[in-house]
Amino acid sequence: MRKLLCSALLLAAAFAGRAQDPNFSQFFASPLTLNPALTGKFDGDFRVAGNYRNQWPTINNAFTTATVSFDIGLLKDRIPEFDQFGLGVMAFSDKSGNGVLQNNFAALSLSYHKALDENGFNQLGLGFQGTYSNKRLDITKVVFLDQLTANGFTGITNEIFSQNQLNVSYLDVNAGILYNGTTDGSNNFYLGASMYHINRPKESFQGGQYYLDPRLTIQAGGMLPRGEFDAIHFSAIHSRQANAVNTVIGGAYMLNLNADPENPTNLYMGSWFRLGDAIIPYVGLEFNSFHLGFTYDANMSSLKPASNMRGGAEISLVYIKRPVDPNRRKLNCPRF
């Protein structure tokens, strides 16, 4: 193995960090990274979602992650009334060590949800996703052990590379299943599972034999109305990839500020918890078909001294184009 030093952070990102995919605290606002079966699973004409996360900003922008997705329901006049057929595309970028290591993804997703009863109150769906991935290591930003002198890392390295950037690309296959239900049309609950890296693609800069471990994620949640203009939303995920485990659970209280159920302005306040790691306060605002969310991770783990309890900020924005027909029957979908 080459005498790569980088720093403790970069080593964790480029090597040990391989064991875990990038993830969002607002997982519920990033549907196509959570479960391919969520593709097209919304009540509207189309959906656009964007997410940005800056993790551990006090440690030289350790990790920045951004994604944008677009999905749409297809063949609505050719399939049964409460079935849903979805198509989606997604772009995803993740940078580690202030841009030393970059991961870029482009994905195409398909899903189909079958109504299990005549009212569409219970549905079961499957989703599949194909992803093109590229990982790049910028050698010009890397520090080697033989550059260490009495004055710091000021020497010239003897390491030789044929190019300033090392690249590896591969194709990835992901899939998911989702159950979605309601007891009377006003509440909602869902349970799903997704598997990423099913084909275990090879990922190595120098011809090694490193293969991505599959990531299994189980997700669940629901919405319970308390009155005409307020409700409780709750959700949780548990994911495992090799030895990396991530469990997040929490909820938010929603209040309709304008007392208008058809064109609401909703305020969300709550918190999620990443077990063994962080408290994640959440504030959200829903208006004119937009849903804006903001979280801030407060580290409570062993990283607390290094991060000064500043785990990172995250923002999400989701837009759903609502149908113009006021008399249509609403579709039963997860309500995040």
Name what the model sees in each region.
Residues F15-A19:
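Sec/Tat signal peptide C-region and signal peptidase I cleavage site
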Residues Q20-F336:
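Subset of outer-membrane beta-barrel
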